């Protein structure tokens, strides 16, 4: 279609009651391009079959089972899309959100993997392998936060008034991590304490009146689902 203006116009002509849209191609180097491609495909679903019929390419038309796979892939990738979108829009510091975002994504993948392990349909079995690979890749990226000198991600997390040290004192964290991050935080404050002690200057307290961002809302509660939770029944 992209190589043929005539075919593109023919595809547009099928869209009589909506804006004229073309499919989006996945681009490996572009963030969220897979999600955007699938979302556009779902929107254009009514036009693909008649377009394929017109050019006698029924072999390229997706069946109901393949559309079901697209629905599920959209559900899987939506949280990644939402977090990427919000992080790219914000102009504020986001270091204190890193662990929360990872936790949300791990939880999402784990729930999906647990559901898929009960399935025996071939495409769901293949999807399980893909999700397990995605989970491992996310673990690899998460492990890199430990390599940052001085545990800066943890310190940034504790500096957020809504987190403090108690963020690392929940059942999700082993006690050793809270102890380690507490020591790192204390070490981080040493030069500032010395500087403050030499000046003896008190800074006026200023309360923040800012309302929470959408990113705060996403991390503070269960992320809203625009797609059905159960895509595997």
Where are these regions (language model features)?
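Surface-exposed, charged/polar loop-rich segments
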Residues: 1-32, 36, 42-49, 132
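Hydrophobic positions within alpha-helical membrane elements
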Residues: 37-38, 165
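Extended, C-terminal/distal alpha-helical "rod" segments
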Residues: 48-233
């Amino acid at each position: 279609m992209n190589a043929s203006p005539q075919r593109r116009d023919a595809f547009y002509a099928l869209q009589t009651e909506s804006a004229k849209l073309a499919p989006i191609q996945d681009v490996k180097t572009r963030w969220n391009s897979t999600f955007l491609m699938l979302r556009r495909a779902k929107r254009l679903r009514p036009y693909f079959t008649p377009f394929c019929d017109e050019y006698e390419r029924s072999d390229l038309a997706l069946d109901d089972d393949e559309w079901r796979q697209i629905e599920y892939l959209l559900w899987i990738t939506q949280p990644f899309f939402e977090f990427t979108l919000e992080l790219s829009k914000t102009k504020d510091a986001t270091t204190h959100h890193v662990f929360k975002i990872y936790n949300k994504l791990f939880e999402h993948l784990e729930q999906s993997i647990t559901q898929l392990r009960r399935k025996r349909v071939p495409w769901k079995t293949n999807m399980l392998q893909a999700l397990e690979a995605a989970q491992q890749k996310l673990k690899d990226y998460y492990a890199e936060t430990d390599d940052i000198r001085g545990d800066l991600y943890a310190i940034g997390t504790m500096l957020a008034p809504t987190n403090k040290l108690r963020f690392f004192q929940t059942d999700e964290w082993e006690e050793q991590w809270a102890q380690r991050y507490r020591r790192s935080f204390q070490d981080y404050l040493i030069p500032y304490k010395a500087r403050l002690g030499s000046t003896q200057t008190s800074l006026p307290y200023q309360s923040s009146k800012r309302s929470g961002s959408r990113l705060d809302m996403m991390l503070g509660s269960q992320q809203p689902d625009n797609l059905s939770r159960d895509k595997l029944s």
